[in-house]
Regions:
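C-terminal substrate-binding/catalytic lobe of Rossmann-fold NAD(P)-dependent oxidoreductases
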Residues: 3, 7, 12-50, 56, ...
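Rossmann-fold dehydrogenase core element
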Residues: 81, 96-113, 131-136
Length: 252
């Protein structure tokens, strides 16, 4: 039985995590971290990890960048593995996470969905086959409450394509102020915010006389919660290091 601490338990993903973990037999929620002390469906909630008093085998974080940064020293001091699901992290904070992984197990992915990670592999394969004759555009869509744009997932997809091509591409987020032809070595990334869109990512390979579209649509947050829970159970048994969805999928 894996004892899980949820940082951001009061948010949308926190509630979904609690509901899904309650249906499993291999893990349970022993505590939550949120803005103030309290209780959620019988689960003790604290405003700081420092109040945990040694509880838990692993942390699942769906919070905010500032909360992630505050959690890192505690996790390191208590050798507590952490699954970082929060996006919009600064380069400095991402570097701190990499450094932390030398001391404890850390799982980090911009998107915890199995399907998105399959999409990432398909994008890499498509870019390798199609080559430079196809322009690449990424369009991501989310609900209005999502703060970061473009999404971490859109950047993850762009990075996957770029790594497959030895870093040949640069990213363009806004063409409104640019009066010039499109650079063949750019990946355009556009963000849409509206309605109740959970998450939609579309990658277009635009070539001579044809367009190939690869797309993933999330219809509920359950897919992200399920991936995070599986990652937590997986990570609790690991040695220090930086892990991601590809590592976990490879060991299934």
């Amino acid at each position: 039985m894996t004892d899980i601490i949820i940082q951001g338990i009061g948010g949308r993903m926190g509630h979904v995590l609690c509901e899904m973990i309650a249906q499993r037999e291999d893990c349970r929620v022993v505590a939550g971290i949120d803005m103030k002390d309290g209780e959620l469906n019988g689960i003790p909630v604290y405003d700081s990890l420092d109040k945990l008093d040694g509880k838990g085998d692993v942390v699942i974080d769906f919070s905010a960048p500032a909360a992630v940064e505050k959690a890192l020293p505690y996790c390191e001091a208590h050798k507590l593995p952490i699954v970082v699901c929060t996006t919009g992290l600064s380069e400095e904070l991402q570097l701190k996470i990499v450094q932390l992984s030398r001391s404890i197990p850390v799982f980090k992915s911009a998107n915890m969905s199995m399907g998105i990670n399959v999409l990432s592999e398909l994008c890499k394969r498509a870019s390798a086959i199609l080559g430079a004759n196809y322009d690449i555009e990424i369009v991501e869509q989310h609900h209005p409450n999502k703060l970061d744009a473009p999404s971490g997932t859109a950047l993850m997809l762009a990075d996957a394509i770029n790594e497959e091509n030895n870093g040949a591409y640069h990213y363009v987020y806004d063409r409104s102020a640019v009066r010039q032809k499109r650079d063949p070595k750019e990946i355009g990334i556009s963000a849409v915010r509206g309605g109740s869109i959970v998450g939609d990512h579309e990658v277009l390979f635009c070539g001579p006389d044809e367009v190939i579209t690869l797309r993933h649509t999330a219809y509920s947050r359950n897919i992200f919660a399920n991936g995070a829970i599986n990652a937590a159970v997986y990570l609790a048994k690991k040695e220090p290091g930086l892990y991601n969805m590809s590592n976990m999928i490879a060991e299934m």
